[in-house]
Amino acid sequence: LEELNISEAQKKRLFFSLLNSRVILSTLRAACRLKNRKFPEGLEDIELRYDNSDNFFKSLEVPCNGKQLFAWASNIERNIYKTIDSFIPEVDVVVEGHDELISLLVLTPQNLYYQGKSLCSRILFMFDDAHKLSDPQRSLFKQYILEKRSGANVWISERLEALSPDEQLKSFEGRDFEELNLENFWNKNPSKLKKVLRNISDKRAALSSEEVTSFQEYLSENLSET
């Protein structure tokens, strides 16, 4: 996509359109596996009950079944591949698509059904090898995920070398770490604290070269604060 002789806006549109088509196709395949159905036969029992209030779908009438949704996404993917493989790509690329990841907004537990019942209670979108994206694509992708903050659960994997020094050093509370005040926590659970400390001390004692079997026997029964 980056090598096409088209505008940056068109590249962005093609990139998100290709991502959307692949996410939709992968989700439909996963839905068949979830319900132990053969693919693509099981697609007819899957429904997308989306009201198209945001006008995301122009050539697809929704609500629709999985077979219709699969055909729509496959057609977009084919058209993008034709554009990429063309030796002389048209200046005005015409592909039905979007400037955002509509797949994450549309493919929700509230919109997906199987044989008239909810397909699942939660969905996790997993993006592997994000480091293989070009720098502009990776930046667009991450920026959208962070800024949109949709209700979708998204998991992204990439090699460490793809991260900038700032990304490698930056950490966020709740995502990378959780601050826990041990004193406040154990004050509410003194018996648990005693049990944990005894367990730790006995394991340390077992590793001692002094043939110490229990750390507790070396402690005074009554300790007074000074």
Predicted features by range, described:
Residues 15, 19, 23, 137, ...:
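Short amphipathic alpha-helical segments
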Residues 1-6:
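Nucleic acid-processing catalytic cores of prokaryotic defense/repair systems
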Residues 88-110:
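Short glycine-rich substrate-engagement loop in P-loop NTPases that contacts/grips substrate
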Residues 128-129:
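Walker B catalytic acidic pair
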Residues 17-86:
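Coupling/switch/interface segments within P-loop NTPase motor domains and analogous charged loops
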Residues 31, 35, 81-84, 88, ...:
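Residue-level signal for secondary-structure boundary elements
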Residues 102-109, 114-124, 133-226:
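The catalytic "switch" region of P-loop NTPases
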